[in-house]
């Protein structure tokens, strides 16, 4: 008799996963398509089936029958009838409304007239519509993006079939000289090209830049690439020159340091959000050329002002690249509406099993505050408590012990508070890179790390995003942005470039019985969803880590 499955599906749309069950890995991978992890204690993980998760799954080609079948296949007990009905009804809402284009402009259509009437009567939708036409309602020319946002809020996400401007033609070919696209990268490009807009979710280190380059080659058009910072812009430039037929003269950088507009222009999010006299000073880059494709790197970090700008770019093809759709500001639905639905998602452990990213062992090392620190902590307000606990001087000695256990590993020590990082830099005799470090100096230090002349770097949040340090195999995290799941994923991602079968090590140092420990649990949720387990160690048990990674 076969063992009952690892899932318990509950009538409130939560799903419990028994972590120790032999089929837990397969069930977790199946759940990622349409559910979100809410809690991840040691033995039972709790997922929630959300509307946005179901709509993303539907946009990626999954049906209600397939999703219910997945739950049935892995469940210990029958799936509640109400949950199955709810899934069918929620999936059925996606695409009931469509946005199309006729000779006069944009039209909102539906075969379900009551739905059309319901949305037409919404006070927030009314200003976006111009009046009835045969089979639908005329959409105001500028309102395509804003209408999609409002329809998601009403629970009727529209399928956008209005097409895209081709942009100015630009011949771009992949130059596969000594390398070739991995199967999952090719699949991601195919899914994006078929749809014309949307988000590709791949683990850190899995080659999202190559997916972007291949999407550019598939569209053969002028392209605007939006990235997190100048270092990332230069890495994109180097990759495009190495992987495509593009030349130096065809790629421009639009950032704080440079203002070039070329057929392929790489701009930073920061420059787009600069204001002068209450106006965005650099919006001209969005209309500088007839862009046929806009690539949003690290789309989960898209600043709120750029959402408004993106709402006006709905006629352009849009590709979002990210390791996680998690946004700490809760604006996942805006990514869905304005960039597009999730088109492709490759689970981290699946890519690891194929050998394309390194395996990683994760540790949480708990330290005790001394008595004076505990008294100061007890007398402090909530926000100051995290700073006190996260930047405890006790962490410096613990970091030194971790590094002593990994004497030859290329190491990143990552934190949030600059005074703490200054102390660590001095204690470890290692260079410090922060947001204040000039870009030219950062690049010199990153290159020294790649070449092995610097083995340890102490870095602030600047290393969270799009920094190519393929040899890093040890990261020690001492503080972060409170309970940020996306930051945890980005930091682990610094270690996941393939290492010839060697396992990377990711340590988080936390102060026991404080909000630092509570936030650490929250930060780990996304990686638990991807199948990573944290080994909990006391600071005096650090030798155990050697046995785990050996």
Where on the chain are the PLM-derived regions?
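Conserved SF2 helicase motif VI
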Residues: 202, 325, 482-506, 523
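Conserved helicase ATPase core of P-loop NTP-dependent helicases/translocases
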Residues: 250-253, 258-259, 412, 419-423, ...
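Walker A/P-loop
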Residues: 195-216
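A short beta-strand element within the Helicase C-terminal
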Residues: 458, 465-480, 505-508
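Post-DEXD/H (motif II) to motif III coupling segment of the RecA-like Helicase ATP-binding lobe
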Residues: 293, 300-363, 527
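Conserved helix-turn-beta segment of the N-terminal RecA-like "Helicase ATP-binding" lobe
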Residues: 230-257
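Conserved interdomain hinge at the start of the Helicase C-terminal
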Residues: 377-416, 422-423
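Extended alpha-helical interface modules used as scaffolds for assembling large macromolecular complexes
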Residues: 1-167
């Amino acid at each position: 008799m076969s063992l009952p499955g690892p899932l318990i599906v509950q009538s409130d749309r939560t799903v419990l996963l028994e972590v120790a069950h032999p089929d837990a890995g397969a069930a977790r991978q199946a759940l990622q398509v349409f559910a979100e992890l809410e809690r991840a204690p040691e033995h039972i993980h709790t997922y929630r089936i959300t509307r946005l998760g179901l709509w993303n799954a539907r946009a990626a080609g999954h049906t209600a029958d397939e999703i219910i079948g997945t739950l049935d296949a892995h469940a210990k007990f029958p799936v509640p009838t109400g949950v199955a009905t709810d899934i069918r009804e929620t999936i059925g809402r996606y695409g009931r409304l469509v946005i199309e284009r006729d000779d006069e402009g944009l039209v909102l259509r539906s075969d379900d007239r009551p739905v059309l009437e319901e949305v037409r009567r919404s006070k927030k939708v009314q200003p976006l519509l111009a009046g009835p036409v045969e089979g639908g309602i005329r959409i105001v020319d500028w309102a395509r993006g804003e209408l999609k946002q409002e329809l998601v809020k009403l629970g009727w996400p529209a399928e956008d079939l209005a097409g895209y401007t081709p942009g100015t033609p630009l011949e771009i070919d992949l130059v596969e000289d000594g390398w070739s696209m991995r199967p999952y990268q090719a699949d991601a490009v195919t899914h994006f090209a078929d749809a014309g807009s949307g988000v590709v979710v791949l683990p850190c280190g899995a080659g999202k830049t190559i997916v972007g380059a291949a999407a550019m080659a598939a569209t053969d058009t002028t392209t605007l690439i939006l990235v997190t910072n100048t270092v990332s812009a230069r890495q994109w430039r180097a990759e495009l020159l190495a992987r495509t037929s593009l030349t130096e003269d065809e790629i421009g950088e639009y950032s704080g340091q440079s203002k070039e507009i070329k057929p392929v222009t790489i701009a930073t999010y920061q420059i787009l959000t600069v204001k002068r006299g209450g106006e965005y000073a650099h919006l001209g880059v969005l209309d500088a050329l007839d862009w046929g494709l806009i690539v949003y790197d690290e789309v989960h970090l898209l600043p709120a002002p750029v959402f408004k700008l993106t709402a006006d770019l709905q006629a352009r093809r849009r590709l979002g690249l990210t390791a996680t759709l998690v946004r700490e500001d809760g604006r996942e639905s805006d990514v869905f509406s304005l960039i597009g639905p999730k088109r492709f998602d490759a689970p981290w452990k699946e890519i690891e099993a194929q050998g394309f990213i390194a395996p990683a062992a994760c540790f949480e090392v708990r330290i005790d505050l001394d008595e004076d620190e505990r008294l100061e902590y007890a007398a402090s307000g909530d926000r100051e408590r995290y700073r006190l606990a996260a930047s405890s001087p006790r962490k410096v000695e613990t970091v030194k012990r971790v590094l002593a256990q990994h004497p030859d590993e290329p190491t990143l020590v990552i934190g949030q508070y600059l005074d703490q990082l200054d102390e660590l830099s001095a204690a470890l005799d290692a260079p410090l890179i922060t947001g204040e470090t000039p870009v030219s100096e950062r690049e010199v230090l990153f290159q020294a790390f790649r070449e092995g002349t610097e083995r340890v770097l102490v870095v602030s949040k600047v290393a969270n995003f799009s920094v190519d340090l393929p040899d890093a195999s040890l990261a020690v995290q001492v503080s972060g942005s409170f309970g940020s799941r996306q930051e945890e994923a980005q930091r682990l991602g610094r270690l996941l470039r393939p290492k010839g079968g060697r396992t990377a090590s990711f340590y988080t140092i936390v102060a026991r019985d404080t909000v630092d420990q509570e936030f650490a649990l929250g930060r780990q949720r996304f990686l638990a969803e991807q199948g990573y387990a944290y080994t909990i160690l006391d600071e005096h048990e650090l030798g155990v880590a050697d046995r785990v990674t050996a």
